[in-house]
Amino acid sequence: MGTRPRGVVLAPWAVVLVLVLALRLAGASHVIHRSLEAEAAPSVPASIVSPLLRTGYHFQPPMNWINDPNAPLYYKGWYHLFYQYNPKGAVWGNIVWAHSVSRDLINWVALEPAIYPSIPSDKYGCWSGSATILEDGTPAILYTGIDRADINYQVQVLALPKDASDPLLREWEKPEEYNPVATPAAGGINATQFRDPTTAWRHAGHWRMLVGSVRGARGMALVYRSRDFRKWTKAKHPLHSAALTGMWECPDFFPVSGPGLQAGLDTSAPGTKYVLKSSLDLTRYDYYTIGSYDGGKDRYYPDDPAGDYHHRRRYDYGNYYASKTFYDPVERRRVLLGWANESDSVPDDKAKGWAGIHAIPRKIWLDPTGKQLLQWPIHEVEKLRGKAVSVDAKLVKPGDHFEVTGIATYQADVEVSFELELEAGTSLLEKAEAFDPAYDDDAQKLCGVKGADARGGVGPFGLWVLASADLQERTAVFFRVFRDGHGKPKVLMCTDPTKSSLSPDLYKPTFAGFVDADISSGKITLRSLIDRSVVESFGAGGKTCILSRVYPSIAVGKDAHLYVFNNGEVDVTVSGLTAWEMKKPLMNGA
């Protein structure tokens, strides 16, 4: 246990970083899509890894494929992040748990892979899982192992630190006398749809963990209980399930503080409200509900039963999947991590030598209404801010735009406050377009019809990011206000990358979500993190979040520009805008 398996060769960059770290010390997506089938290809040489559109400050290894974030935790002064990684190429396959450590969740140093096939329970794969801090302060990892060839037969495996005194947790062992700790053999469980154990929580003398599964088309979170964290027994019923949702990948379950309270809670702490999240294999999006937990019955009850179906909320309305939270005891917050896959082609990924990034870590908490979560980039990312430029009280007339100059905007953090300017005696709703209720459950489709170039009443207004000087290439992040059937404003937030690149063979979907915000004052805010091939945006203080991958061919590096635009019929004032260049952190040796 804990030794590197034959055939897993540590790349030179990792060796160097281990030495550097020694001196300093003195991932859902498990379905094997045919387009992502792993090949028996050698590792990609660093010499052909293309830096052109590699992110500057988002998490990624120097090369090859990554997907789900796994088992984030804080231990003895270090943040740990494990993640699904292919050491042999830029496509899915050959998965091991790569391992990086950080003091601040922004600057990362890579260690050797922590978990890899080494016992019968995981001989054919080590898929996603979670970490739990036990009562004595020792971390434990539960993850999904594949123990049979060709059929992806899934079992749950326990791993423990070989040396709990090591703050870097470099070696892990898997006690064969206990593993696998859970199998699909009993209870009529589909053995190929049984994965991704959660962080466990303790209640009434027993540990509980969830494992994602499906029965027919009903997705569910199965409950397992244990007294000693080694021998687990399946409960008679799931914590929760929902019809027609398909397989629940990467479930997550945690308590939240009261409405408006930003302090996070440890997973075993009692909470008045709980969040249950599932990554739906059918849609490849992350959904959550807020509700209550009955610890005696091990049942979860969403506050809004329709939240399992038509009124489902998403962490992010863009390219964001297989997310995982953890409680950060240092900052007393709950932190959300997620995976953003590429949306170019597999040949493109092979050519550039890398695929997949992680979103900037986000702090999440319950909003004052208690009906949704708010998300915001962790404050540590602001340490990367460099040269800044500001714009104040700038009027943008209908059909106009202006450029934000003075900094390099291909790697930037932009915060902007908009204020709608109405003529005396004119209300916001008079100018707003009527909302078609056919789009009530499909903001993304509405954005596809009412994109950034479709002139409207109140909006679209927002940012053109990663734009070329001639605007042939541009990605729009914007708001548009409608008037619903009850005479109330309905706010759409959208990222429209349909003109983001002149390159062919790119997947360029619009992404959108409705913003549950009071815009009667005419004011709304937007923050966008721009990083070469990714745009992460946060509307109305984190009520709606959208991550999009884009691949400009002209608006690259110093040739990328930033604009504010208004394609509505109402004047818009930029009451305040600040944009910062973002520096590159220490990133796994890249």
UniProtKB/Swiss-Prot annotation:
It is an enzyme of class 3 (hydrolase). Its EC number is 3.2.1.26. It catalyses: Hydrolysis of terminal non-reducing beta-D-fructofuranoside residues in beta-D-fructofuranosides. GO terms for cellular component: extracellular region. It holds the Pfam family Glyco_hydro_32C. Gene3D superfamilies: Exo-inulinase, domain 1, Glycosyl hydrolase domain, family 43. Keywords: Cell wall, Glycoprotein, Glycosidase, Hydrolase, Secreted, Signal. It comes from the Eukaryota. GO terms for biological process: carbohydrate metabolic process. Glycans are attached at residues 190, 341. The keyword rRNA-binding does not apply. Induction: By wounding and bacterial infection. Residues 1-28 form the signal peptide. This is Beta-fructofuranosidase, cell wall isozyme.
